[in-house]
Amino acid sequence: MYGFQEEKAAHLGDDWKSMPLLFYHPYMKDVSYAYYPDTLRILTGIPDGEVCYLAHFHEAHWWSCACARSASGKMEIPNLESELVYLPMKYTKGNYYPSGFPFWFAGGEINTFLPDWEKTVKVRLYRKYPVYGWLRSFMGHVVGGTFEGSMTKDFEDGKTLYEIADTPVIARNRIFLNKPVKCRYIRYKADNDKCAELAEMTFYANGKAVSPIAVWGSPTEKGNMHVLAKHVADGNPLSYYLSLDKGGEVVVDLGRVAVIDCLEYMPRNDDNFISPGDTYELFCHAGTEGWKSLGKQRADTTCLDWIVPDNALFWLRDLTRGREEHIFFMQNGRQKFPTF
């Protein structure tokens, strides 16, 4: 909080009575000039003299962040953060309403998301939330790791089932083996310069998952119940195993000899990839009409295909579980999530 802002109070006049608290609070100061050099100039679509608001999307809502008075059908907002999506809004009787279409602001570039309902395109969706740097790092920790099968606990006769050569781009990675391997014990062993870090591993014989009767691994951090070996077989994509030392391993005992022809592994992840079995609903923003549903789908694999209007802003919701979701648009055939 700052001291009393006399210039703010003098500038507002009687308008404060019809404005959100954020914009007339006399003890709050706008310091965006110290961080953002870009100025936004757009058409407002509202009568001259009225206040137009800008909002950004976060946690399933549009949140107001700036405002300006409409003049000659336009508004100008200095010191606005770039490379974000904004929505022009009006404020009436304590509520915000869209007054136009959302747009991408990148300094001198403005791209309005005006859905073209006459021109539809097919898109393939893999996520509902941005991929942040920490997530890429976690998923990259499996590179160089190997899966080995053996008839004995000591893996003297171990055979390599699969080696992870690159950072996975999805959470659930199903691998069909070139040649089935007969074994009872299977282990995941990390590269020598990495700790063993894995969320899930599942093994299949003739299309059916083989449930292990026991799981063990290299030592973990003492007292840390969040990184235990058993987590690789608990069916929870958010739990994970993490060895204390580099080059660690985690082993499952299948309880019987099985001919393994397929494996599925999940690196440590945020569970915001498309999850088979979950039901999703896709929305696009229709300007003053708000969000418009493009239908629902139940995922049967790790991606969703949708026919959508071109040049639209989207919001994919998981109706089954989870809370983290964010808006995105398509760029060069891929999802782009604008983030702070």
Residue ranges and their predicted role:
Residues 32-53, 57-58, 133-137, 269-271:
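Structural motif
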Residues 70-79, 174, 251, 301-306:
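Short, surface-exposed beta-strand/beta-hairpin micro-motifs centered on an aromatic residue
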Residues 90, 102-182, 194-262, 268-275, ...:
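Disordered, acidic Ser/Thr/Pro-rich linker "stalks" and the adjacent N-terminal cap
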Residues 59-67, 95-100, 153-163, 209-212, ...:
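Surface-exposed loop/edge segments in extracytoplasmic proteins
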Residues 1-28, 82-83, 87, 168-171, ...:
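Long, contiguous interaction/targeting segments characteristic
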Residues 49-69, 147-154, 158-162, 270, ...:
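Short amphipathic beta-strand segments in non-cytosolic proteins
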Residues 2-3, 9-34, 95-129, 335-340:
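Extracellular beta-sheet/turn segments enriched in Thr/Pro/Gly and aliphatic residues
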Residues 73-93, 103-105, 310:
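Short Pro-Gly-centered beta-turn/loop motif in secreted/extracellular proteins
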